[in-house]
Design a protein with these regions (language model features):
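Active-site beta->alpha loop and helix N-cap motifs at the rims of alpha/beta catalytic domains
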Residues: 1-45
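Alpha-helix-loop-beta-strand connector modules within alpha/beta enzyme cores
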Residues: 1-7, 54-60, 112-123, 169-183
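Short beta-strand segments at enzyme active-site cores
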Residues: 5-8, 67-68, 192
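Flexible glycine/acidic-rich beta-alpha junction loops that bind and position SAM and/or redox cofactors
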Residues: 12-17, 98-103, 159, 195
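Catalytic alpha/beta core domains of metabolic enzymes, predominantly
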Residues: 29-154, 165
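A hydrophobic, small-residue-rich beta->alpha segment in the mid-to-C-terminal subdomain
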Residues: 148-180
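Mid-to-C-terminal alpha-helical segments outside catalytic/metal-binding sites
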Residues: 177-200
């Protein structure tokens, strides 16, 4: 009960009408990348017109965006969308690291991104995501800095160097244990909704 449902509007090479085709179903949240970035085999193309169209659809259907930040410019693009009335505060931002050709998993980069987010949007919540071997590092750093964690097989299939992760549950369990280490509380579904300013 209370599970948060989030859709993805990702999808290289597709029009906004396709990438946002499910938003009329009014999930709680949907991803919104606020810029383009090089991926290993091509460009994750998010033209300003596409971003604006997806943001407007999310406003229309009362879907909270998860702002995906693959490089620093995307944070300032999100700030411009707020000024234009196309994004509503409080924001929720996801900082993504470890995608080849995008931001490397360097702690000082996350530190700066978080400091800029706090300056621009003091009420925002944020998550850090590490792709591949950087996942565990980003889990640690996010907890240390007061953020939230993303984990799971979509981003990383290994538990450690010696073996594959058995399941998403195993990776989630590891983060739950890390929360104890950093004296952080694992949110219930109800608490997560409150943190993200989502309807009950």
């Amino acid at each position: 009960p209370g599970m948060i449902i989030q859709f993805s509007t990702g999808g290289r090479g597709r029009a906004a009408s396709e990438r946002g085709s499910m938003l009329h179903l009014a999930p709680d949240m949907a991803s919104l990348a606020t810029g383009s970035v090089n991926f290993p085999n091509g460009i994750y193309d998010n033209h300003p017109d596409l971003i604006n169209e997806l943001a407007q659809q999310m406003l229309d259907y009362e879907v909270k965006p998860e702002i995906e930040i693959f490089d620093l410019a995307m944070l300032y693009n999100a700030a411009n969308l707020v000024k234009q009335g196309m994004l509503s505060e409080p924001l929720h931002v996801q900082f993504v690291f470890g995608v080849p050709n995008a931001l490397p998993p360097i702690r000082n980069i996350l530190n700066f991104e978080v400091s800029e987010l706090n300056r621009l949007f003091p009420e925002a919540t944020w998550t850090a995501a590490g792709v591949g071997r950087s996942q565990l590092d980003l889990n640690h750093w996010a907890l240390e800095l007061g953020g939230h964690c993303r984990t799971g097989l979509e981003d990383n299939i290994r538990y450690d160097k010696s073996r594959l992760a058995a399941s998403n549950a195993e990776l989630v369990g590891r983060v739950a244990n890390l929360c104890d280490q950093y004296d952080r509380h694992v949110a219930s579904a109800k608490e997560a909704r409150e943190l993200l300013a989502l309807a009950a």
